[in-house]
């Protein structure tokens, strides 16, 4: 996907910064949250205990080299996240009340139907929704297990260490307060928690590295050497790679599809903007946070005492933090609590989206799921680490299978959407929302009636401009008409000048095709090239 999108995570850096600031989104645009809030929600589900406990598990099982595999998978995962978020925004459903239904289950069903694979889309979409419910419980169990473990350990109370379910009950109550407020409530909580927990945790990690600064060169050398040698229970390069990729998948979620759900709720008219936003998630998660966590563990040498099978996850990271001061693991406890809490909120939303897809929006089903999630938090706090990791890995793998298969078939749609947006942006046909009262910004707010009227007026003017462009192109005898090949991503379904206006990106894509000549017919991952109709 990285090659197919021509390294967009690198070339799209400037545009992504503008998108995150809400420069191209108006408050009256369809959606519920800003692009930044969607980014914070997804990061809350990825930058969490997968970075703290997951990296500790990876280093214990596969040695220091597993950390570099996590980082490598994170870089490659940027394009996968772009694809998921773009498709999630493109094929979302907007209900009458303005709420959003989106995610892989929707783009698998509707996206595959649009290219002639309707039955396959229905099967994959339904399967993904079922697996997402399992994945939500898997995340629930893992997060509460590790939060309860480190809180009990930090307290020094033998009573709490023997009754971690009590801590699980407290966590469950706090989660219940937030999730019964819906997606906007979740977005508000995560967008506030995310910066605070990131700052606290990163400062702690830097402190550990500075205290053990003399060991940094040796630690980096061990990581590079460990990429190809491996050690312990998962010895060998294949074993190290598997462990690293497993933990990266559990950590950054690239390929799992959750980005499609988080970004489907964003206020935007351009699906590609969400791809440009989501691409940062694996970079922040796997390359920055995971790598720094791994370095902090390796420089202290605490991983050498792990036997692999009996690894304690987050407690290994806490042991590394104790090299700074005896009280320092308390700061990690605070960060873990915030990480785990925000992740629980994010996956509660994902599970509800899946259930809504399967059964429609029925309060009885949604409330039952929320109650079961709260009960699951209590169960997870008392379960063994090995059990919750096994369940979480299995559920995430099941989610990834239909999602990655669907993205393979929809690869052309993704490229057309992203390239079309870039061309329109360069051509000036996508204008920034300069009025601060109309722009979404970092945090979404509902528009006033006056703002809605102004936005609708601008939208009517834009539609008229596109209609004029449509008629002009229709009158051009050299411009291609209806595609001869169903699902062709480079031909424009022009129809007649009175039909609905096609996506401007299709016009620009055809111009790209024409400029490349007849020999420029592309062939994507899912099939053959384009054909022009006479």
Predicted regions located by residue number:
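Membrane-interface loop-to-helix entry segments
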Residues: 1, 5-17, 124, 132, ...
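Helix-loop-helix module between adjacent transmembrane segments
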Residues: 1-2, 44, 76-98, 109-145, ...
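N-terminal alpha-helical transmembrane segments of multi-pass membrane transport
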Residues: 1-49, 59-66, 77, 408-436, ...
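Extracellular loop-to-transmembrane helix junctions
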Residues: 1-15, 60-98, 285-292, 328-331, ...
